[in-house]
Amino acid sequence: MIKETEQIPGPRPLPVVGNLFDMDLEHGLECLIRLADDFGPLFQITINGEKQIFATSQALVDELCDESRFHKAVMGGLEKLRMLASDGLFTAYHGERGWGIAHRILVPAFGPLRIRNMFEEMNDVAQQLCLKWARQGSSTSINITDDFTRLTLDTIALCTMNFRLNSFYNNETMHPFVKSMLYVLRESDIQSMLPGIANCIRVKARSRMSKHIQLMRNMARGIIQERRDQAEPVDDLLNTLLNGRDPVTGEGMSDDLIINNVITFLIAGHETTSGLLSFTFYYLLQNPHILERAQNEVDEVTGGERITVQHLGRLTYIDAILKESLRLMPTAPAFTVTPKKPEVLGGAWAIDAGQAVNVLLPVCLRDRSVFGPDADEFRPERMLEENFSKLPPNSWKPFGNGERSCIGRAFAWQEAQLVVAMVLQTFDLVPDDPSYKLRIKETLTIKPDGFRVRATLRRGQSATGLSQGSMSASGATSSVASPGPPAATGAQSNPAGGQRISFFYGSNSGTCKALAHRLASSLMGRGFTEQKLAALDTVVGNLPTDQPVIIVTTSYDGRPTDDAEEFVRWLESKRPVLQGVSYAVFGCGHHDWAKTFYRIPILIDDLMHKAGATRLTALGTANAAVSDLFSDLELWEETNLLPALREAFPPSNSSDVESSEPHQLQICVSKPRRVDMHRGLVEAKVTAVRTLTSPDSPEKRHVEFHVQGDTTWRPGDHVNILPVNPLSTVSRVLAYFQLAPDHSITVNSFNTQGLPSATPVSATELFSSFVELSQPATRKNLKALAMAAESKTDEQELIRLHDSYDALVRDKRVSVLDILERFPSISLPIGIFISMLPPLRLRTYSLSMAPSFKPSHGSLTFSVINEPAWSGNGQYLGVGSNYLASLTPGSLLYLSPRPAKDAFHLPADQFNTPIIMICAGSGLAPFMGFIQERMTWLKQGRPLAKGLLFFGCRGPHLDDLYYEELSEFEDAGVVEVHRAYSRAPDDVRAKGCRHVQHRLVTEAEAVRDHWGRNAIVYVCGSSNMARGVQTVLEEILGTLPPERYVAEIF
């Protein structure tokens, strides 16, 4: 039995005017929100003689979104807007025939791939915004809402209609369409609230509205006619409007329907998005910690390089910020539904068929029963995917509901993500008026009113640099003819074998060289022949045109590797003509070096394409911070490179086919040999070693060495070390393959992956010095191992490992050797095993001795990694650290100094520039060099500015590194040391502090004093420590300019 329904509450209406006096024509939304507070989750008012019901809770909205019971109603201001857009997608009545035709034609035009393909046009307009702000300078007060309106209007016109409004080239006034639109939206809202008689006497207002409507429709007609006059068709939304056919009726759209939807897209495609962007930046500037996290995410994901569509999916915090902004300020603040038949809403309130019910989003989306007691606060974490996915149904509806929801949501979202990311990447923003309180400007949509900002370019960028960057990004190019081989007219195959390929790399430490060798080896087994494998500098001016060119390279602090400098210089300055060259680029990077992430691979890829070369496939990338480089290379090879090669250079005969068997190296036993396969290394002699920690703490060691010749470095620099695999790991290999340590192995193969070729090497030397034994197995390795397993159970388990690769193999550091030992039924020839192993790479460490302190000497301070393996198989031994720990005085090691980024060096003016050094554990290494350099200066009689060191460790008798040396330096006035002990915070030296960030708070006054004297802050340590330090420093000091806050993360 249905219980008796209740009367819907609300303020008492007056005769004739209803609740008009309960509303404010300028701030109607604010009035409705107040009424929701007064009357609860469902209330009603009478406006213009009609009853209007408003729902304000998630539970009621969940019912109203049931399309089997309710459908969209076009009422109020939206109905008045039909004078402009009639049966356009947004203003059409439910079931209106024109809406059905347009909807069925247009929905496919907003599919994911089509939206992704609009990215470059979105990027074009976003760059115009950034260039305008950059040229105006940091002293200019920016009306951010107006500029976002220019941006979003230009973007929708360009992306969907290939029509440039060029709003940023008319800085003083808005485009006439915007002025007319704002008037029509506002007037529609006002007319919906006034009695009919009042509207009748507003003759001038109605006349102005008619003129504005005519202007907007004439503009739409002009856009349509210009397209019809074009000889060449353009595949965009406007083309779909003009030429699309309804798959149900076979009809196209009438001219009026086309005009209605052109106007609809120009309005709906920009008005709400500009409001979203404006509110988002308001909330970010009100919450600096959120702004910092967002900016850090952009830097980490993009690496400071040109934003691409692939980056957007990784901007998870930006995504949450936008969702949270729309939750608090839904820019289309209501949608209206009506029941198909009489309904009882919420089990209590009767709703007649045809009665409009408005979903009041600014209240619904702050429902405390869903979003908690802090629902009014801006907290993006609640919108991260793991939390967002757990919200009750229909809790977040800013884009409307069901079949009448916004079909351009993906367009708006991609645009908003791009713009937020680009602005955060390019500028530091501050409010123009720090005391500004949010005011809302209402039409049928909402935006901030009077919100202005100032924008300062980040990281020393310039407006000129942005201009040049945008030209490059948009594809502008000029070329100068240069002599070279004639362009190839088609794909050619090598009659002696498969299609020839040349591989070129840029590699300082050997990683990219190893990747190039691995890629060459893999393709050799797929019907291709290696023509050449060499450094990029060897091919300057002579790129082959009769075969594909594959490039594997990286960046070092934004610069090319040593063996690619001439090649990049040639591309940049000589502007060669590269027609006939077919190429693909694979780039490596690490997101901790955010400013220069993938810079050189992207640069090479872009310059070669602009010089006329044919890009075989999109740039492949691998981020060493979050993935396995070799697995990423294999994935790119399988999904991108190989299909492109097969299409561009098809096999010339049946023998040129991909082998299903892994390539097996040809092996014979011979005499031993040891070689140095890496360029640029110098020999050093170990002069001293010592353990810096007690037996009760994880081991940290000091290794000092002497280098002859003119090898130099600066305090703060790094050094690449050529290691040797731990003997225990090598012994496992020898035992598995039943080799004696002094067995000789000779590698005879057309591709040796950087191994010594046709030269006998002892088994111990081969597995110690030439290959990575602890590298995680790749997906391709797992496939081959599964094929080699004789046990069906083992085969199935290996397939399971392949299918759950990240969790079960990569993240647990499971090597090929681990798998062989775990699955004894695998029968794997040693040649295939060796072919699965990447070449042994160099390891990088910070130097911990200043060359001025002890000429021709250097030292390393490092943690020795010897811990239970995450795979569960014995101990995991860090290759580099265990090698260094095995050295004794007199041992030889091979190394190559490598400069740190410029900012991570002592200031040039040490007399006037204090320094603040913050670190934990072995992060002390570079600062020992800093302090020693300062000691040298002091001994030379040079005055020094103050220096503070904040150092964290476990305790005074555990791992308080270099305690005696630092005490001497402190006594000499070189540095002032502040310690934190995680296991002994009560020690007098720690002053109750467990971590360095706690000690920073304790010494906040000294930190502020040094900062006020233009100190530079240096941080070295783990990412967790660095984040904590930065948070505390922001609280103490405020904004940290990048030139004065420099972090090195390991």
From Swiss-Prot:
GO MF annotations in UniProt:
aromatase activity; flavin adenine dinucleotide binding; FMN binding; heme binding; iron ion binding; NADPH-hemoprotein reductase activity
Q: Which UniProt keywords apply?
A: Electron transport, FAD, Flavoprotein, FMN, Heme, Iron, Metal-binding, Monooxygenase, NADP, Oxidoreductase, Transport
Return the GO cellular component terms, semicolon-separated: cytosol
Q: Which residues bind heme?
A: 406
What does the note accompanying the cofactor annotation read? Binds 1 FAD. Binds 1 FMN.
Cofactor(s) the record lists:
FAD; FMN; heme
The catalysed reaction is: 2 oxidized [cytochrome P450] + NADPH = 2 reduced [cytochrome P450] + NADP(+) + H(+); an organic molecule + reduced [NADPH--hemoprotein reductase] + O2 = an alcohol + oxidized [NADPH--hemoprotein reductase] + H2O + H(+); decane + reduced [NADPH--hemoprotein reductase] + O2 = 3-decanol + oxidized [NADPH--hemoprotein reductase] + H2O + H(+); dodecane + reduced [NADPH--hemoprotein reductase] + O2 = 5-dodecanol + oxidized [NADPH--hemoprotein reductase] + H2O + H(+)
- What are the residue boundaries of the FAD-binding FR-type domain, all occurrences included? 679-907
Flavodoxin-like domain mapped to chain residues: 501-641
Q: What is its EC number?
A: 1.14.14.1, 1.6.2.4
Summarize where FMN binds, as residue positions: 507-511, 585-617
Claim: Hydrolase is one of the keywords in the record: no
Broad class of enzyme this protein falls into = oxidoreductase
Q: Summarize the biotechnology note.
A: CYP505E3 can be used to synthesize the high-value flavor compound delta-dodecalactone via two routes. The first is the conversion of dodecanoic acid into 5-hydroxydodecanoic acid (24% regioselectivity), which at low pH lactonises to delta-dodecalactone. The second is the conversion of 1-dodecanol into 1,5-dodecanediol (55% regioselectivity), which can be converted into delta-dodecalactone by horse liver alcohol dehydrogenase.
Enumerate the residue ranges of region (Disordered): 459-495
Superkingdom of this entry's organism? Eukaryota
Please name one Pfam family that this protein belongs to.
NAD_binding_1
Which residues lie in Polar residues bias regions? 459-481
Outline what the protein does: Self-sufficient cytochrome P450 monooxygenase that catalyzes the regioselective in-chain hydroxylation of alkanes, fatty alcohols, and fatty acids at the omega-7 position. Performs hydroxylation of C10-C16 n-alkanes and C12 and C14 fatty alcohols; and thereby enables the one step biocatalytic synthesis of rare alcohols such as 5-dodecanol and 7-tetradecanol. Converts 1-dodecanol into 1,5-dodecanediol as major product with very little sub-terminally hydroxylated products with the 1,4-dodecanediol and 1,6-dodecanediol more abundant. Does not use hexadecanediol nor decanoic acid as substrates.
Family of this protein: In the N-terminal section; belongs to the cytochrome P450 family.
Protein name per UniProt: Self-sufficient cytochrome P450 monooxygenase CYP505E3
